[in-house]
Amino acid sequence: YTLSLHDALPILLIVALGGMFSERSGVVNIALEGIMIMGAFSSILFINIVQSSGAALPPQLLLLLAVLIAAAVGVLVSMAHAYASINMKADQVISGTAINMFAPAFAIFAARMIRSVQQIPFSNTFRITKVPVLGDIPVLGPLLFQNTYITTYLGFAVLAVSAVVLYKTRFGLRLRACGEHPQAADSVGVNVYRMRYAGVAISGALAGVGGLVFVVPTSTNFNATVAGYGFLALAVLIFGQWRPSRILFAAFFFGLMKTVASAYSGIPFLANLGIPNDVYKMVPYVATLIVLAFTSKNSMAPRAEGIPYDKGSR
């Protein structure tokens, strides 16, 4: 999967910000990878069905409808994690792992049952060759407004909205309170269970959309994988200290590493080194290990993250 930086960055931004909402509410969500797969599967299946039917929908409208479907399915899948974690007080890591294991198997099975194929094909007509006016801006035009997708800008929109919601709204204040001091939040009338469900639902919606955002620029079929971007988004979340502004920086760093790993052959200096292809593929994950080794000790995770809330305990 070859991605440019301006394609990889929105994926990591959207999914990491989704994880932020869940974990800020106090629920660990390592199911991001599985939710991405389910969101991508459902939305690509929708695109495949519409394109196969011959319906004359404008490409960008079709893509936006697919985004809504990916978000809806992401919410639906995340509710299974929310119920297990919040109501049943199950181990949140185990619950997330179960979804990660279930999603690719289900996607392959459903694709075979519904379309009689393992890989769901679609026609990629969504690329925007050039944004009028903006595409003519020197330097920035070719970088951001040529040969791009509408989903590229979605990542930055999600970043702006997330920052406002988290720090400038009553909802954001209550969400953060439930992740830090749920008993205190409950004592002033905040429904901790409801807020945690909301956090996980937002997380699921964004992760589902992130799955679609991954598939559209990389391929013309979906084969039940998102190349580990869900796990990489968790590293972005931790490195970004659960804060939108820092998550942007972390997403840029890891997106750059992922881009180098997938497009090194187009960089003359790296291509001439004679280093095996597999070594470059390791770069983003080795970088993840190194960064987390140096930053995890000082990470400021929400205090109640991963701790099931019991209304009767104080």
Briefly describe each language-model feature range.
Residues 103-168, 269-279, 299, 304-314:
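Transmembrane helix-bundle core of multi-pass membrane transporters
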Residues 2-9:
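Short, small-residue-biased leader/transition segments that mark boundaries at the very start
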Residues 180-194, 264-314:
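Cytosolic-side transmembrane-helix boundaries in multi-pass membrane proteins
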Residues 217, 221-285:
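Transmembrane alpha-helical segments in multi-pass inner-membrane proteins
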Residues 24-28, 77-134, 168, 227-228, ...:
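Short loop segments and helix-boundary regions at transmembrane helix junctions
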Residues 56-104, 160, 253, 258:
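Alpha-helical transmembrane segments within multi-pass membrane transporters and channels
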Residues 144-222, 244-245, 249:
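Helix-loop-helix "hairpin" substructures at the membrane interface of multi-pass membrane proteins
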Residues 10-20, 34-38, 76-79, 179, ...:
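Hydrophobic alpha-helical segments embedded in the membrane of multi-pass proteins
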